[in-house]
């Protein structure tokens, strides 16, 4: 009996992981979480719909880099590839001295469980080369997202 329960639990976990990966499928930016999510000096946070329901957010994933100096070229390259391929629309960018400091992008909508979800990527370089990279999906629109920030 324990084996059956364990097998069902593993199948459910794999299904949830597959659905999450599918949500970011086709994005170069998705590889940022895979590449740096468990790296020393990086904090990864993932919150589910249960934690975020009052904000109309279904999924929140973020990476906080203590020092993004080494990772920054890869992150910027992924963002540029996604922009060039038309997989995301620029909502706002702040560039200072030729360097991207803040960016808000909207991704194509996602159909999931009879819902149409909006998806966003947020990126900000802070003081002392710290940085935050965020992926959000939910029912909120871009104006609501900006109001939350």
PLM feature segments, named:
Residues 64-100:
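Compact soluble domain cores
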Residues 26-78:
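Early exported N-terminus immediately downstream of N-terminal targeting peptides
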Residues 1-29:
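Bacterial Sec-dependent N-terminal signal peptides
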Residues 23-25, 40-43, 81-84, 111-115:
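A short linear-motif detector with a strong N-terminal bias
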Residues 9, 37-40, 80-83, 149:
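Generic secondary-structure transition motif, activating predominantly at the C-termini of alpha-helices
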Residues 85-148:
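Surface-exposed, polar helix/loop patches in the mature regions of secreted/periplasmic/lumenal proteins
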């Amino acid at each position: 009996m324990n084996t059956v329960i364990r097998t069902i639990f593993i199948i459910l976990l794999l299904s949830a992981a597959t659905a999450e990966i599918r949500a970011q499928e086709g994005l170069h930016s998705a590889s940022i979480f895979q590449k740096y999510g468990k790296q020393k000096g990086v904090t990864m946070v993932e919150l589910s719909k249960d934690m975020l329901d009052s904000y109309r957010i279904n999924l929140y994933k973020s990476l906080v880099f203590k020092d993004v100096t080494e990772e920054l070229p890869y992150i910027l390259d992924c963002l540029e590839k996604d922009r060039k391929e038309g997989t995301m629309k620029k909502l706002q960018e702040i560039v200072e001295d030729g360097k991207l400091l803040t960016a808000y992008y909207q991704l194509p909508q996602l159909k999931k469980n009879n819902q149409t979800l909006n998806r966003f990527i947020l990126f900000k370089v802070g003081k002392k080369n710290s940085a935050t990279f965020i992926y959000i999906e939910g029912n909120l629109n871009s104006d609501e997202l900006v109001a939350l920030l």
